[in-house]
Amino acid sequence: MSTQDRPSGSGQDPQDRLTHIDEAGAARMVDVSGKDVTARTARASGRVLVAPRVVELLRGEGVPKGDALATARIAGIMGAKRTPDLIPLCHPLSVSGVKLDLSVADDAVEITATVRTTDRTGVEMEALTAVSVAALTVVDMVKAVDKGAVITDVRVEQKTGGKSGDWTRS
C-alpha cells in the first residue's frame, strides 16, 4: 500500500486530529461557520469488476434490466445530492454540479465523479457517494448476469479549494 493509499498522521500535530471527534471522544458536526465560502471541487473514482459476458452486453445489446450505464449515472448524481442524508456528520451543501463518467473496460465498469460547489467545506464525500451509488447501481443492473460483480478502488483522486488547498493523488 503506497503512502497515498493509506491514512496518515501521527496524531501529535493539531492538524492530524479527527475533526469530527470532540475532546471527550464524542462525535460532533464540525462548525464551519467561520470558514470562507470558496469554489471547491472533488473528483473520485471507482471500479466494478464484472464478468466478460457483462462487458459484452454493456458494449452491445445491453443487460436485461435496461441501460445500466445511464441508470448508474443518474443514480450517482442523485447520491451526491443526498450525501448528508446518508453520512450523519456531513454538512448539507449547495452542490453546483455533478459530472459522472462511466466507461466499460475489458474487465470492469470504470466510474469517475466530479462534484463542484461554492461553499464553506469540500465536496469529497459527495464525490465518493456519487461513485459508490453509481457502482451499487451497476451491480444491481448486472446481477442477473453476474452475481459476482465486485466494487473496488473507490477513492478521492483530487480536491481543489478551501483552507487546506489543492490535493491530487499521485
UniProtKB/Swiss-Prot annotation:
Q: Where is the active site?
A: D140
Q: InterPro entries from the entry?
A: MoaC, MoaC_bact/euk, MoaC_sf, MoCo_biosynth_MoaA/MoaC, Mopterin_CF_biosynth-C_dom
Instruction: Please provide, alphabetically and separated by semicolons, the GO molecular function terms listed in this UniProt record.
Output: cyclic pyranopterin monophosphate synthase activity
Which pathway does it take part in?
A: Cofactor biosynthesis; molybdopterin biosynthesis
Q: Name one Pfam family in it.
A: MoaC
SUPFAM superfamilies in UniProt: Molybdenum cofactor biosynthesis protein C, MoaC
UniProt cross-references to HAMAP family, sorted A to Z: MoaC_B
Oligomeric form and interacting partners: Homohexamer; trimer of dimers.
What is the purpose of this protein? Catalyzes the conversion of (8S)-3',8-cyclo-7,8-dihydroguanosine 5'-triphosphate to cyclic pyranopterin monophosphate (cPMP).
Name of this chain's protein? Cyclic pyranopterin monophosphate synthase
Lineage here is: Bacteria, Bacillati, Actinomycetota, Actinomycetes, Kitasatosporales
Tell me the name of the encoding gene: moaC
